[in-house]
Amino acid sequence: MPVSFFSGRAAAGAGRKRMENVKDIIVIGIAGGTGSGKTTITQKLQAHFGSDVTVLYHDNYYKPHHDLTLEERSKLNYDHPDAFDTGLMVRDLRELKRGHSIECPVYDYTIHDRTRSTLHIVPSRVIVVEGILIFQSKELRDLMDIKIFVDTDADVRILRRIQRDVKERGRSLDSVINQYLTTVKPMHEAFVEPSKKFADIIIPEGGRNQVAIDMVIGRVQAHLDRRA
């Protein structure tokens, strides 16, 4: 979740020492529609594994549009695969898997643009990659050991999105609804929902499905125990 109104999503893992045994690293991809509960699952993994978890948010890899005005940026389609610099995320994830630190871009939702600052991120034993369209790229998928799709009813997702964008991102209700109808919903149907076929695990109802979350935690713990 956003650590501040300015910095968007902060990638967990900043400030720790370099990972020495890179064979220990497991990468978990968590995809699903907007408001599906992806971040809730990510937070539960963080709560269980603590400092063993580093998180990369696809949102931080939105392409920069410094050449456009705020009004122009607000009208862009942010739910299409082309909105993301996924190639950069692939390169960054590869570096993390090699045990190297990265400088992660930072996206600011309030200005609809990437900021000039970066986050210094170091790898950990569990790397979570989270985003609505992370399964669209084969290069990115191939770097994941476990691929999870969070499947939540559309009515629930839009209500969560309205609440989040109005409260946390300074959006108006009208702008959120208009964006949902013109880009979010059609892009979900065209790109997000079809990417579910790439998932190893489908979790209905997101963070409320404790049985499924416990199974994921058990799978990750087994991996860590084997490498201990």
Region locations from a protein language model:
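Conserved lysine of the Walker
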Residues: K38
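ATP-dependent NMP and nucleoside kinases share a basic, alpha-helical "lid"
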Residues: T115-R169
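P-loop (Walker A) phosphate-binding loop of NTP-binding proteins
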Residues: G33
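Conserved nucleotide-sensing/catalytic segment adjacent to the nucleotide-binding pocket
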Residues: D67-Y109
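Hydrophobic positions on the alpha1 helix immediately C-terminal to the Walker A/P-loop
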Residues: I41
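Short beta-strand-centered segment that lines the nucleotide-binding/catalytic pocket of NTP-utilizing
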Residues: S51-H66
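NTP-dependent small-molecule kinase module
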Residues: S4-F5, R16-N21, V122-P123, Q163-V166, ...
